[in-house]
Every structure is written in structure tokens, then in C-alpha cells.
């Protein structure tokens, strides 16, 4: 029997809580909002990690910097990555003088069944995000979910329902929301320092391409069938998809997992980096609860670039930034402009300048966004990148890819 994504969600996310919270694909996916008591966890919050690649390692290092958090468990379909993860986290805690013995679970389901784990980091490939996140929410866990939040628009609607009907906290891994430079740029836009915003330029890269990698030998200890889940069977293994590692001698991944660049397995740069930049753009102009009203692919209706149009008149395009040439966002208003990336900040008005403090280390290891998640777990109030925002950002990204694929403009009908 062929597996589609809707049936996949229903069959993989239901068991642990007894009742499935998924419903029909209608509206914006909001369910009844239920809240738990403040700080039901005690002094230490126990965290498990699912999907143990490069991104998860960086994110987890950020979580180890939070004093009331302990990473206690992990799961992955690749055994060597489990071993590497355990060794890395145990070593970090040992240097802090903290006893640690991270448990490896045979599956994410087994990890979620442990009532002593309060929250999970989910950093799998995109096509597993929704199913595992919904299972975690049903199991009573709070969730830190890597971006892009979901693989499809439908999944985002169902994830909103799961969060709200279970009364859980979900933080999307859009770390730029907790970055002081991006926060400053957003504040300047929202305070009208640039006047009325007329145009946004966001640089993040191209949509995905069809899967065309040749087959290579499967590394020992990788369960490729489980990795695939609902994906087409013709997506055979290639070293770039889940890069093999070595523990002795130590050999890291030779690249980021290439699944993100192919339309069968990911959303290309549009969702990979667009999830960051579109998120900041929509936040700044007050559209992160609504999204665009029209998306136009390059070469259609006179559009030179992939274009998003908002009902407040703002036009956003995916194109190179004039000053920095890095992935980032440029806001152009009646009174001037601001251009911000993860390393640079430029503006036409020196009074609006922001000077970055270089703290060293990998960008993803900075703990501010993870601290925001933990703070929300304790307060039971929404974090700064909640599920609805993640859904609207993902929707804008996916609409960009759909418009590119069908080669005509897409307009919102409500």
C-alpha cells in the first residue's frame, strides 16, 4: 500500500498518548488552548535529542550551557551518530564537573515513552519533523523543533492543533529571533525609523531540484528504511544524504546532509535558509501571523526574482543583498534602509547602527534561543518562535517553492 504524508502522520503520531489530535485540513489549524501549571518540572529539566547530526550537536552544546538543563537521552537511525553524541555530551558535562550518562534509545518512540524526559530537541531531516513532534506532544513533552518547522503546509496545521490541544510548549529553531542584531533591525522597522517599508530583499538561495544522486554503499549501522519513512522508494542512499562518519579514527561528516537540496526530501535553500530570513522579514512588518497574499515566481508577470507580496503593500524578493552579499535581510523604507546578516549590520542612517559583539564559537551554540525555550517551559507562556509563527514562515517558504514549480503566480483566496 502506498503511504502518503497524511496517513503517515496519523499512523506514526498516535500511539503514545492514546488519542490522536489530528483533524481535517481546515482553517489555520488552531485548537482549544490548554495550559499546564507553572514549572511542573522541578529544579532540573531533562531533555532528550532525536536526530543526531551536525545541527543537533551544535544545538545541544547550546543547551548544555543552561544550568538547569540536563541532556539525558538520545535516538537516531544511525548507530555511530548515537555513540558520537553520547561521547560528546558526556565529555562536555564531565568538564563542568557534572555526572552524565546519556542513554541511547533504540527508537524515538522508546525515548518519548520515558516520563522522566520533559522535553525533546528534534533535529531530524525535515520530512520527519511533524510526525515525531506530534508524537512528542501527545506524550506530554515540550518540543524544541528545528526549522523549517514542517515539510508541508498540512503538517503545520496539524502541529498547531497538537500543541494547543495538548497544552505544550513548542519553540521553532529560528535562532535569529534571539539574535540582538536581528532584534535591533526589527525594532527599528517597527518603530518607524525607516518610514513606511516599501521593499524587502532577502537572500537565502534557490528552490530544490529533482533527486538525481547515484546510489552508493550504505554505511554499517544506518537504518535507511527508517530514515526514509514516507519518502519515495526511488530515493536511494547516497553518501551526501546522511553523510557517513567514523569514530575510530574520528571522521566528521564531509558535508551537511544533502537531503535539504532535493524536492523529494527537502525544500532547497528556500526552506533551509528562507525559514530564517523570511521569518525575520515577516516579523518586522507584522505579517508573521498572516503571511503573503501573493507569490510570483521569477520570470512571471514581470518578476525578476521570486517575489512575495503582502496585504500592507510590502514586496519581498529573494535576491543578492547590495552591501553584504551574505544570507540576510534588507529593509528599504521611505527614510532609509537597514541590511542585517549573521555577521554584518549596515544602514543608511548611522544613528540606527548596531555593533555586533563577537563571542566566538558556532552561531548555533549561542544559548539565547534555547534559554527562551526553557523560560517558556517554566512560565508556560509562548516562546518567541511559537508554533503559529513557525507555520506561517514555513507556508511562505513552501508557497515560494510551489510557485517556482508550477511557473505561475499563487494568490490567497481568503
Across the structure, where does each feature detected by a protein language model lie?
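A contiguous active-site-proximal alpha/beta segment in oxidoreductase catalytic domains
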Residues: 142, 150-226
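Contiguous beta-strand/loop segments that form the cofactor/metal-binding neighborhood of enzyme cores
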Residues: 184, 196, 201-388, 392-414
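Sec-exported extracytoplasmic/periplasmic mature domains
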Residues: 64, 87-91, 164, 190, ...
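Conserved G/P- and acidic residue-centered "switch" motifs that form tight phosphate/ATP-binding loops
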Residues: 147, 192, 380
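N-terminal glycine-/serine-/threonine-rich beta1-alpha1-beta2 phosphate-ribose binding loop
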Residues: 2-145, 154-169
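Extracytoplasmic/secreted proteins, especially bacterial periplasmic and envelope-associated proteins
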Residues: 54, 58, 80, 84, ...
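Active-site-proximal cap/loop segments of hydrolase catalytic domains
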Residues: 92, 153-156, 164, 182, ...
Amino acid at each position: 500500500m502506498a503511504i502518503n504524508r497524511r496517513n503517515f502522520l496519523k499512523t506514526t503520531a498516535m500511539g503514545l498518548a492514546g488519542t490522536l489530535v489530528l483533524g481535517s485540513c481546515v482553517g489555520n489549524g488552531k485548537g482549544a488552548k490548554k495550559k499546564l501549571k507553572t514549572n511542573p518540572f522541578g529544579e532540573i529539566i531533562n531533555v532528550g535529542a532525536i536526530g543526531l547530526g551536525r545541527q543537533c550537536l551544535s544545538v545541544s552544546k547550546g543547551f548544555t550551557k543552561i544550568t538547569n538543563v540536563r541532556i539525558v537521552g538520545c535516538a537516531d537511525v544511525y548507530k555511530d551518530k548515537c555513540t558520537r553524541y553520547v561521547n560528546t555530551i558526556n565529555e562536555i558535562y564531565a568538564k563542568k564537573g557534572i555526572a552524565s550518562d546519556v542513554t541511547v534509545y533504540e527508537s524515538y518512540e522508546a525515548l518519548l515513552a520515558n516520563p522522566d524526559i520533559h522535553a525533546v530537541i528534534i533535529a531530524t531531516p525535515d520530512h520527519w519533523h511533524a510526525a515525531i513532534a506530534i508524537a512528542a506532544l501527545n506524550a506530554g513533552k515540550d518540543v524544541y523543533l528545528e526549522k523549517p518547522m514542517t515539510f508541508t503546509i498540512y503538517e503545520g496545521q496539524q502541529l498547531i492543533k497538537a500543541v494547543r490541544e495538548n497544552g505544550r510548549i513548542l519553540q521553532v529553531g529560528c535562532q535569529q529571533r534571539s539574535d540582538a542584531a536581528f532584534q535591533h533591525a526589527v525594532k527599528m522597522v517597527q518603530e518607524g525609523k525607516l518610514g513606511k517599508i516599501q521593499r524587502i530583499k532577502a537572500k537565502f538561495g534557490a528552490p530544490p531540484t529533482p533527486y538525481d544522486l547515484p546510489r552508493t554503499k550504505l554505511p554499517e549501522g544506518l537504518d535507511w528504511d527508517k530514515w526514509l519513512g514516507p519518502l519515495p522508494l526511488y530515493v536511494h542512499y547516497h553518501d551526501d544524504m546522511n553523510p557517513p562518519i567514523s569514530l575510530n579514527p574520528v571522521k566528521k561528516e564531509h558535508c551537511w546532509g544533502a537531503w535539504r537540496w532535493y524536492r523529494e526530501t527537502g525544500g532547497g535553500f528556500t526552506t533551509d535558509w528562507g525559514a530564517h530570513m523570511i521569518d525575520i522579514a515577516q516579523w518586522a512588518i507584522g505579517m508573521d501571523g498572516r503571511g503573503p497574499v501573493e507569490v510570483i515566481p521569477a520570470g512571471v508577470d514581470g518578476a525578476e526574482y521570486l517575489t512575495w507580496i503582502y496585504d500592507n503593500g510590502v514586496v519581498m524578493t529573494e535576491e543578492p543583498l547590495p552591501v553584504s552579499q551574505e544570507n540576510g535581510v534588507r529593509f528599504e523604507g521611505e527614510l532609509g534602509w537597514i541590511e542585517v546578516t549573521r555577521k554584518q549590520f549596515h544602514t543608511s542612517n548611522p544613528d540606527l547602527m548596531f555593533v555586533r559583539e563577537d563571542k566566538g564559537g558556532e552561531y548555533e551554540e549561542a544559548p539565547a534561543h534555547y534559554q527562551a525555550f526553557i523560560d517558556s517551559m517554566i512560565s508556560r507562556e509562548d516562546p518567541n518562535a511559537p508554533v503559529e509563527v513557525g507555520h506561517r514562515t514555513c507556508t511562505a517558504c513552501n508557497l515560494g517553492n510551489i510557485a517556482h514549480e508550477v511557473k505561475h503566480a499563487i494568490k490567497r483566496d481568503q
